[in-house]
C-alpha cells in the first residue's frame, strides 16, 4: 500500500512566488484575504525540500483557531529535520486559518458576528475543495487545497474545541474511497497513535471535510485529533510529535526507529453520550481506557451536592473523548466512546 503514495524527484519546490531549492528550508507566506482596513491576511507555510526522491507530505494544524496543540506539535516535529538528509519534501501550514487563530476561537468569530448569513458556511474545515471566489471559509479551503493537491499525502491535526479532550486518535476517510483510503489507513498505522477510527459514518467522513476531499483527489489523508482545545499540553505535544516523526520514518523520509504505543485500538464507530440532567460534571473513567457496558462514565451532581445522574456506558468501547467543562446542561455531551 505504501507504494501507492506518490514519490517526487528532488526538484525546486514552488510555493506561491517562492522557489525552495532541494536541500533547503523556507518560511514564507501566501496572500489569503484582505480586511476592511486594507490589512492583508497571509497563510504561513514552512517548506522543507530534501535532496533525495521521496513523498511530498502536507502537514496542517489550527484550521480551527483554538486548536493550538497542533501548532506546537508541528514546530516540535520539524525542528530537528535537516533538508540535506531528507528524502522527499514537506509542505507545512502550522496555522491553516489565521483569522480563527487571531480570535483564539474555533471560527473567525468577529467576521461571523458581523454578518452570520453571509459568512455561512463558516467552518473552513467542512468547505473543501473550496472556492477562490466564495466566502471566507471557502477561500481558505481553496487556498489550502491548492497546496494539498500537489502533495503525495496529508495529515490534518486537530483538537476538540474548548471543553473537550481527545486521546491521540487517527480518524480515517471512509474505506469506500478505495485505494487512496487504503493508503491513508497505512499512513495512520505508520504514525501509530494508539487509537485509530475506521468508519464510514459520521462527521469526519462527510463530504467537504479536508481529509475526505484530499483522499478523493488521490492525496491519502487522515484527521489526527489530540488533546484539549485552547490548551498547550506538554505530554500531548510530545505524543503528537512522536506520531508525525513516525509517519516520516514510515514514509522513508527520515532514517530512525519508529516509537510505538504500548497498546493499539482500531475502532468502527463513535458513540457520543449526552447528559439527561444538568449540574456539575464529575468524570469517573480514565481517558483512553476500555469500558464495559454499564460501567459508570460520569456523575452529574446538582448545585446542592446531590447526584442527579450517573452516566453509564451503553455499549462496550474505549473512552476516547472526555468533556472537561465543569458544568453541563441536558443534552450536552459528557463522553465519547470508540466502539470496537
Briefly describe each language-model feature range.
Residues 1-340:
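Structured catalytic-domain cores with a bias toward divalent-metal coordination
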Amino acid at each position: 500500500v505504501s507504494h501507492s503514495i506518490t514519490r517526487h524527484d528532488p526538484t525546486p519546490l514552488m510555493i506561491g512566488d517562492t522557489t525552495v531549492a532541494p536541500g533547503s528550508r523556507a518560511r514564507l507566506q501566501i496572500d489569503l484575504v484582505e480586511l476592511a482596513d486594507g490589512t492583508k491576511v497571509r497563510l504561513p507555510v514552512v517548506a522543507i525540500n530534501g535532496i533525495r526522491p521521496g513523498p511530498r507530505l502536507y502537514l496542517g494544524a489550527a484550521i480551527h483557531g483554538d486548536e493550538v496543540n497542533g501548532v506546537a506539535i508541528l514546530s516540535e516535529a520539524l525542528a530537528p529535520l535537516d533538508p540535506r538528509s531528507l528524502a522527499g519534501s514537506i509542505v507545512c501550514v502550522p496555522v491553516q486559518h489565521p483569522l480563527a487563530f487571531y480570535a483564539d476561537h474555533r471560527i473567525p468569530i468577529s467576521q461571523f458576528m458581523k454578518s452570520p448569513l453571509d459568512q455561512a458556511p463558516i467552518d473552513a474545515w467542512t468547505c473543501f475543495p473550496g472556492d477562490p471566489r466564495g466566502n471566507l471559509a471557502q477561500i481558505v479551503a481553496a487556498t489550502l487545497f491548492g497546496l494539498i493537491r500537489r502533495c503525495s499525502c496529508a495529515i490534518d491535526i486537530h483538537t476538540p474545541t474548548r471543553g473537550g479532550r481527545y486521546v491521540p486518535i487517527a480518524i480515517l476517510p471512509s474505506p469506500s474511497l478505495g485505494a487512496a483510503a487504503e493508503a491513508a489507513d497505512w499512513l495512520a498505522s505508520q504514525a501509530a497513535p494508539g487509537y485509530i477510527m475506521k468508519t464510514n459514518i459520521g462527521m469526519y467522513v462527510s463530504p467537504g471535510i479536508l481529509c475526505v476531499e484530499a483522499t478523493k483527489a488521490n492525496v491519502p489523508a487522515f484527521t489526527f485529533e489530540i488533546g484539549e482545545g485552547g490548551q498547550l499540553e506538554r505530554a500531548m505535544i510530545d505524543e503528537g510529535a512522536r506520531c508525525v516523526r513516525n509517519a516520516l520514518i514510515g514514509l522513508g523520509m527520515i532514517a530512525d526507529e519508529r516509537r510505538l504505543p504500548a497498546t493499539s485500538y482500531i475502532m468502527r464507530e463513535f458513540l457520543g453520550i449526552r447528559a439527561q440532567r444538568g449540574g456539575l460534571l464529575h468524570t469517573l473513567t480514565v481517558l483512553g481506557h476500555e469500558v464495559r457496558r454499564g460501567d459508570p462514565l460520569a456523575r452529574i451532581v446538582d448545585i446542592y451536592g446531590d447526584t442527579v445522574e450517573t452516566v453509564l456506558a451503553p455499549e462496550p468501547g474505549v473512552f476516547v473523548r472526555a468533556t472537561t467543562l465543569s458544568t453541563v446542561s441536558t443534552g450536552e455531551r459528557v463522553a465519547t466512546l470508540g466502539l470496537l
